[in-house]
Design a protein with these regions (language model features):
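N-terminal active-site beta-alpha-beta segment that forms phosphate/nucleotide-binding
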Residues: 2-95
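Non-transmembrane, aqueous-exposed alpha-helical and coiled segments at domain scale
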Residues: 19, 29, 131-136, 141-149, ...
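Gly/Ser/Thr-rich active-site loops/lids in small-molecule metabolic enzymes
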Residues: 53-67, 140-171, 193, 225-234
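Ligand-binding beta-strand-loop-alpha-helix segment within the catalytic cores
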Residues: 65-135
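Structured beta-strand/loop patches that form or line metal/cofactor-binding pockets in enzymes
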Residues: 120-129, 146-155, 161-198
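A hydrophobic, small-residue-rich beta->alpha segment in the mid-to-C-terminal subdomain
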Residues: 193-241
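Conserved small/polar residues in nucleotide/adenosyl-binding loops
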Residues: 258-260
């Protein structure tokens, strides 16, 4: 599917965040290898990074390479792509075969034991960017199940990269089902990536930097920066109801109301 204003905004927020981290010296001026998930949001993120000339041409160390990566290699915005799977359209694949002299020193496919190897991911300082279905107030991520029961997709290699990345980012729209459901929830209905692995949450609303924050500080950052305005007050009310004395406040009796 083509990009739309919502996914474009998420992509731009990711690009702005990475450019800001580079300016602060957290990311070196030469940049770092990126891992990207698959789908519309991932393509929008890569598109935004390709357009943002404050970010230098970069490398991909990822699991799956899609059409968008090939396009950015042709444009010179991606210098090199390493993956274990080339998942592109037939036309794109034919274009690669027809231009093999150009691509032979710009693409490599490795076994997943290498492409997803935790030590390699950590040593290279990979920045991981993956898509969430829902994120809770403390930074736990559900990336596979709708309502905690219906599988949308598998976890793929996102766990390998998220847990070992230099910076781990999750993106999602702030709402689903035409605004009827908030993607920012008090507690995820299914857990794929825990708060200990998630550094940054980005929606079309903004960026929540969770690094170095306590659970309550993470909750405040996520509500303020990532939640949709229609659901912010509800989430603040939940946090207040959960009480202020616990390390990670929850009001279990109220959770079912959020997911209905």
């Amino acid at each position: 599917a083509a990009a739309d204003p919502l996914t474009d905004k998420i992509g731009q927020n990711v690009a702005d965040f990475l450019a800001a981290d580079m300016k602060r010296g957290i990311i070196p001026s030469t940049f770092l290898p990126l891992q990207s998930g698959v789908g519309n949001i991932a393509n929008a993120v890569l598109g935004a990074l390709g357009r943002d000339k404050t970010i230098p041409a970069f490398e991909m160390y990822t699991e799956v390479i899609q059409n968008s990566v090939i396009g950015l290699i042709r444009e010179g915005r991606i210098k090199f792509g390493s993956a274990c799977s080339l998942t592109v359209t037939n036309d794109c694949l034919e274009g690669i075969y027809n231009d093999m002299d150009f691509f032979r020193d710009k693409l490599v496919l490795r076994p997943s034991e290498i492409s997803n190897n935790p030590e390699v991911v950590r040593r290279l300082g990979v920045i991981s960017i993956n898509t969430a279905i829902e994120v809770d107030l403390y930074g736990n991520v559900n990336s596979t199940h709708i309502g905690g029961t219906k599988m949308m997709n598998g976890i793929g290699g996102s766990g390998d990269f998220t847990r070992n990345a230099y910076i781990s980012i999750f993106t999602c729209p702030s709402v689903a089902k035409e605004g009827k459901i908030s993607a920012i929830v008090p507690m995820v209905s299914h857990l794929d990536h825990s708060e200990h692995s998630v550094n940054i949450v980005i929606t079309e609303q903004g960026v929540a930097d969770l690094r170095g924050k306590s659970p309550k500080e993470r909750a405040q950052a996520i509500i303020e920066n990532c939640a949709h305005p229609d659901y912010k007050q509800l989430l603040w009310d939940y946090l207040k109801l959960a009480g202020g004395k616990a390390q990670t406040p929850h009001a279990i009796q109220a959770l079912s109301l959020i997911h209905i």
